[in-house]
Amino acid sequence: MIRRPISFVVGIAFRQPRFHHLPIFRERDKPLRKRRGNVILPSLTYHGFLPEGVHCTNLQAVRDRFATNPLRVELFQKLEKFLHWASTTGRFSCAYIDGGFVTNKAAPSDIDVILQTSVPYGAAAFHAMEPFFAQGIDSIYEIYSVHLHFWCEGFPGAMTDFRRFFQYLRPQDAAPSGLNEAARKGIIRVDL
């Protein structure tokens, strides 16, 4: 018999759910309810990545965990400004955050962001993305240090679901850590 770890909350013992190791994001979870408050992020793994899955939190928790030196503080401030811009459009439900910023790298160079439209694939979703393409993806990178990607529900099958794609480790990141190419890592979701 496999025993699950026991946790204690206010003096009451309970067993962790049987499926606590599975990724948080599943296609059928849409739409996820809004999360408020400071949701604590899990500790980084031994290899310096978030545990596998999508970790829902807020910007304060991201700041607390990852803005740990002057360079990271600067990157976080740029991210915060970028997400404020995206949020003020009212056309995006959430942002997924990934890249070296959400690892133990001392000097990450940028942040990967996936904006998810609040409407499904179609003209309204493309209209939501339009201001960002008008600004220019390269210009956004120069100003905010953000590699920008988009996702909307119902994208055709040939389109890459970056939410899943960014959970895979690149071979050049996996090999130095002694991980295989199929290894996965976590990403962060922040509601806008």
Task: Put a short name on every predicted segment.
Residues F25-Y96, V102-S109, T117-L192:
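Catalytic core of pol beta-like nucleotidyltransferases
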Residues V113:
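Structural signature of FAD isoalloxazine-binding scaffolds in flavoprotein oxidoreductases
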Residues M1-N38, S118:
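N-terminal amphipathic/basic-hydrophobic helices that include classical n-h-c signal peptides
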